[in-house]
């Protein structure tokens, strides 16, 4: 009898999981556009570069509380994010060219 009760317990857990999954599926999913995500990523790259440039200007002007290592770290972050953006662009262009060269 305990084996049957164990199986019934597992079945009830599976049913509860299935019902919660159905409830989550019925909720409206936010639409995420590719263009919106790309624009947001470009904005983050731009913000990173602007912050690094501002930090470097503050250090150059001798403002207190701005350390050289912070400036160098911000400049490297900006450089890496720009290189990442360039590589993403290159991959997108390559994918576009591949799609355009496909036979219809």
From Swiss-Prot:
<dbReference type="GO" id="GO:0003774">
    <property type="term" value="F:cytoskeletal motor activity"/>
</dbReference>
<dbReference type="GO" id="GO:0005198">
    <property type="term" value="F:structural molecule activity"/>
</dbReference>
<keyword id="KW-0975">Bacterial flagellum</keyword>
<comment type="similarity">
    <text>Belongs to the FliE family.</text>
</comment>
<dbReference type="GO" id="GO:0071973">
    <property type="term" value="P:bacterial-type flagellum-dependent cell motility"/>
</dbReference>
<protein>
    <recommendedName>
        <fullName>Flagellar hook-basal body complex protein FliE</fullName>
    </recommendedName>
</protein>
<dbReference type="InterPro" id="IPR001624">
    <property type="entry name" value="FliE"/>
</dbReference>
<dbReference type="Pfam" id="PF02049">
    <property type="entry name" value="FliE"/>
</dbReference>
<dbReference type="GO" id="GO:0009425">
    <property type="term" value="C:bacterial-type flagellum basal body"/>
</dbReference>
């Amino acid at each position: 009898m305990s084996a049957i009760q164990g199986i019934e317990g597992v079945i009830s857990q599976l049913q509860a999981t299935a019902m919660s999954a159905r409830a989550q599926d019925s909720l409206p999913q936010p639409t995420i556009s590719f263009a919106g995500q790309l624009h947001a990523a470009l904005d983050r790259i731009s913000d990173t570069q602007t912050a690094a440039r501002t930090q470097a200007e503050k250090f150059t002007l001798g403002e207190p509380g701005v350390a050289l290592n912070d400036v160098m770290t911000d400049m490297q972050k900006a450089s890496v994010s720009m290189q990442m953006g360039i590589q993403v662009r290159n991959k997108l262009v390559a994918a576009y060219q591949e799609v355009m060269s496909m036979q219809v």
